[in-house]
Regions:
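A short, charged, and often flexible helix/loop element on the N-terminal side
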Residues: 61-88, 142-145
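Carbohydrate-associated surface elements
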Residues: 41, 173, 190-193
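Conserved donor-binding/catalytic core segment of Leloir-type glycosyltransferases
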Residues: 4, 208-224
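An aromatic- and histidine-rich active-site surface loop
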Residues: 14, 83-91, 99-136
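Acidic anion/phosphate-binding donor-loop and adjacent secondary structure
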Residues: 194-209
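Membrane-proximal helix-turn-helix segments that form the acceptor-binding/catalytic region
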Residues: 31, 91, 95, 110-113, ...
């Protein structure tokens, strides 16, 4: 199966951001799927590019990097401009790249547009993944003030949910919020997890045969 994943914040474990998409896509590839991630250049990620569009590969996963800087330290207008640049280029990929399933990971909410393009113009299955509840987050953070923009953002949010083949929420609370507001049942909560292989292997317990009945004193250091 060909999976096309729109996610602006892709990073590997070398970066200082969540590796959920890195871990998931790596496992999908290992199961025989062809995976392409469309990402930007996030300040906390280790992903960097020299050209405007650059192809890199990680564990068999094709990562197309749109060399658009995303940094929370930038002004609100510059961040919004970065979101729209990524959205426009991603829509081109939604129209042209081979895909059976398209995943848009929000926020920002603008990442939903390439998913809608693939859904309505190409008839592809569209998975809308919710990491943050936009536009609520943007409103609370003061990114969106204008009433007309707020109304448009809520309309677009509803459109993305309605068009989705399935909705993925990263927490049970998000799932409940979407269900309560829209009444959709095609939603699953898939929480973040940890790759326990990164923490090493279990240490084999020592063989105590021959130590008993001798008496041993053990100093464990100062406690308290």
């Amino acid at each position: 199966m060909n999976i096309l994943y729109f996610y602006q914040y892709f990073t590997t474990p070398k970066g200082s951001y969540g590796t959920r998409v890195y871990e998931f896509t790596k496992r999908w590839y290992e199961k025989g799927h062809h995976v392409t991630v469309i990402t930007g250049v996030y300040a906390k990620s280790d992903i960097r590019a020299d050209k405007f569009i650059e192809n890199q590969e990680f564990n068999g996963v094709n990562v197309k990097i749109i060399n658009i800087s995303i940094d929370n330290r930038k002004s609100t207008l510059r961040r919004i401009w970065s979101f729209f640049q990524y959205m426009l280029v991603s829509c081109w990929y939604a129209l042209t790249l081979k895909a059976d399933v398209v995943i848009s990971s929000s926020g920002p909410l603008t990442v939903g547009l390439p998913g809608l393009v693939a859904r309505y113009l190409r008839g592809r299955k569209f998975i809308f993944e919710i990491r943050d509840l936009w536009p609520e987050v943007a409103i609370e953070l003061g990114i969106i003030h204008n009433r007309l923009l707020i109304k448009a953002a809520y309309w677009f949010e509803k459109k993305c949910y309605k068009a989705s083949t399935h909705i993925i929420a990263l927490s049970p609370g998000m799932k409940a919020d979407i269900e309560n507001r829209f009444g959709y049942s095609n939603i699953t909560s898939v929480t973040n997890s940890a790759n326990i292989d990164l923490f090493g292997t279990l240490v084999k317990e020592p063989d105590l045969k021959g130590l008993i009945p001798m008496t041993y004193a053990i100093y464990n250091g100062n406690i308290g």
